Amino acid sequence: MRALSIANIEDKRYEYIPFEGEFAEAFGNRERGGIWIVYGKSGMGKTRFTLDLAKEFDRMGYSVLFATLEMGICSDFHGELSSAGIRSKVNSIKFVEELTLEDLERTLSKQRSPDVVFIDSIQYFTDQFEAKAEEIIRLRKKYRSKIFVFTSHVEGKEVEGKAAYLVKRDSFVRIHVEGFRAIYKGRSRGGRKGYYTVWEKGASEYWIENENQ
């Protein structure tokens, strides 16, 4: 154990994600690294939001790996890519349909490893590919500059399953997707607006209807 003095903490330098526009308005000044968890009910815009976020990281020059474990590269996912405006001549995001924790660790150990890893979903990663929450957290601590973005199903208002709950507790950024808005729920203050709109028309109809109830 190494104890830090106040001076040590004052001298520490941090690297931040240079978000602009809607992403900055939603999520503010986020430190690079750690676990992000994106959770919400089906049909609310989780997949589209994570693709928008992956596209934004790619635009900023981060190398991105997207593990579409749940949907695979099916026609629906192809449609989501098109809707998000992700195209081969513009974007360089890499996609995989299968990923074990051993695969991920091997990938991260390489010299040109991804800066950001998206895993859809935490339930598929733990149930189908036998990843453990403790191992995910260990990887987060080992690769501190890497960003891990997990999507999660919900049970009521909470993430579904013990593994997802443990990963959420360790997460630096929590984003609840409801009514086509990705709403910042992290530990510290988010952006001025506090949410990112995934689909303007759908969000407008959903929130007007809910406000009138």
What is each stretch, according to the model?
Residues F95-T151:
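Phosphate-binding/switch loop-helix module in NTP-utilizing enzymes
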Residues K142-Q213:
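Phosphate-binding/switch region of NTP-binding enzymes
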Residues I73, T100, K132-E135, A163, ...:
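Helical mechanochemical/support elements of P-loop NTPase systems and associated helical scaffolds
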Residues M44, G72-I73, I122-F129, E155-E158:
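Short acidic, S/G/P-rich loop/turn micro-motifs used as interaction or catalytic elements
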